């Protein structure tokens, strides 16, 4: 692990910085000249550099080939800049595209931005440098109308092929009431059905060769092994997969667009629905990013409570993943065991938050309320129960010779391939890369906890599922420390932008009463800036990149989810394998479609 510099570790997370002291700024200036860039000061915690469109690919290639390279395109998307009022010192732009690159060896990130005019929405594709740019560029074109020249297949990915318009543009309606009433005529229904017909030629596939015809099989979007509304079109030669095309978007709900119409506070419940098994884990990156904008430092008790709830939901999600993986391989019983154990997690979560799957319990500056009396006993009972149950899963199912035979060596990939496709979480650690955000870039007090990061070597299905078992043990270890070392103190920060403000002060001071009224009715106004927060979520790295224009609502909410990148990788891994191997591979990825489609 590469430590961040002393200046990084001592500066408050919310301080606005230009990061000119980051070595990469000097490297870029030496290579391209200081006049080639505009460095933007933000609260993202990384250098944000505006580059000229003509130099973009050259700059990305340079960073990709440095001695300590930026090996992963972590995220790529766009921003409609036309209504943004706080842009002092930035290049003129109607739209912009940002490229978030990550370096494992440096443990650092950099964000490149390109300014575009509405009359010339073109930029070169980055797919030849980072193959995972494919889906991100398709989505950016679909949402903003920005064309990526040279892209191999620039078509819609989230919306139906018949959709008109670019939904994340500021002039595109955000609510159904702003559209004309929807009417599905028989003719339109036929057109919609026709658009779903898979045409191999559109994807560069052949229907057959001189000697044989290929079969095309739709797996999903309603199939128990597709783990949600997900279609994957298989090109088969007998049982062998020649090629495949994942088809996503059936679960798309416009989560990022909703962020532009909800207050900073009222958007919290929407975060729970991004990865619906993650609960409070989903809320963590959002509230931390908002707190960076606001300049809020939360009490230690809040940090530890957030860690405790996050690890409870991590255990809950991992239990479902392990049991359904075993079911995909062919064993039924562990699923019923797992739901018994998950019920205990939900009972504990419900006792603390009042809700089960979607608690919406974290707040800007704290949590909704303090821990209830008796929480220690409930947590103690669970910590005494769970370790033995984990042992039974391993002994009864995961050491089974049939399961091993179907998963060892299946759908294996190495660290280089994982990084090229943006794989994070257990999928990356199974290849031997010990990258866990909780350890490498601690947040919410994780630096105060003693736990290990399990790592695999083979990068196959069996490694991925066994890593999750070990991660469960480490989560129990973290919960044990929460039980023994829960700090005293308030459950909210004493800050003007804490939302909602402490209610007990509203009847004593007119100023706090006014603040309470405004923040509960209209919502708090966050300072104009940009912030970013990534967390180690249940399925990989989840992050929020927020842009504030000094309003009660976000100007741009970008949600980067791990499952999106993981599904894009499927064709490169599964070509040449059997259909039965694909089922095991899908079960080993650990995804839900709400996390993919947002």
Curated annotation (Swiss-Prot):
The EC number(s) this enzyme carries: 7.1.1.-
Catalysed reactions, as listed in the record: a quinone + NADH + 5 H(+)(in) = a quinol + NAD(+) + 4 H(+)(out)
Name of one Pfam family that matches: Complex1_49kDa
Keyword RNA-binding belongs to the record: no
Organism superkingdom: Bacteria
Molecular-function GO terms, alphabetical: NAD binding; NADH dehydrogenase (ubiquinone) activity; NADH:ubiquinone reductase (non-electrogenic) activity; quinone binding
Main location: membrane
PANTHER family assigned: NADH-QUINONE OXIDOREDUCTASE SUBUNIT C_D, NADH-UBIQUINONE OXIDOREDUCTASE 49 KDA SUBUNIT
Function as written in the Swiss-Prot or TrEMBL entry: NDH-1 shuttles electrons from NADH, via FMN and iron-sulfur (Fe-S) centers, to quinones in the respiratory chain. The immediate electron acceptor for the enzyme in this species is believed to be ubiquinone. Couples the redox reaction to proton translocation (for every two electrons transferred, four hydrogen ions are translocated across the cytoplasmic membrane), and thus conserves the redox energy in a proton gradient.
Protein name, as recorded: NADH-quinone oxidoreductase subunit C/D
Taxonomic lineage from the root: Bacteria, Pseudomonadati, Pseudomonadota, Gammaproteobacteria, Enterobacterales
Gene name of this polypeptide: nuoC
